[in-house]
């Protein structure tokens, strides 16, 4: 679902749960790459072309691992507009980042909102 927001502090586009690709097919935010950097820090690359297209340095996303999870903000560590991916790096410090760390390549993130900031 796509919601338009017109407030000055908010982005023009706000993505909820999934997005519609060019063929009108609903698509979730799939983890295309996962790399454990050390025992408590993980890098993930997420398939999110609409967010990658608009991302700028210094922005962040808000994600929710599953429908019952809490929303957490994470800095955009990088993006590839051509591949349509967004990279995040996070430290495992609580229940939500622990749950996120248990996801593997091919799994999907429930909500992935941004870019913000």
Where are each of the predicted segments found?
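Methionine residue identity
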Residues: 1, 20-22
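Ferredoxin-reductase
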Residues: 23-105
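Generic structural signal for buried aliphatic residues
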Residues: 61, 109-112
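Short, surface-exposed secondary-structure boundary micro-motifs
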Residues: 66, 114-115
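A generic "binding-loop/recognition-motif" signal
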Residues: 96, 115-116
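Iron-sulfur-associated redox domains of electron-transfer enzymes in respiratory
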Residues: 102, 116-117
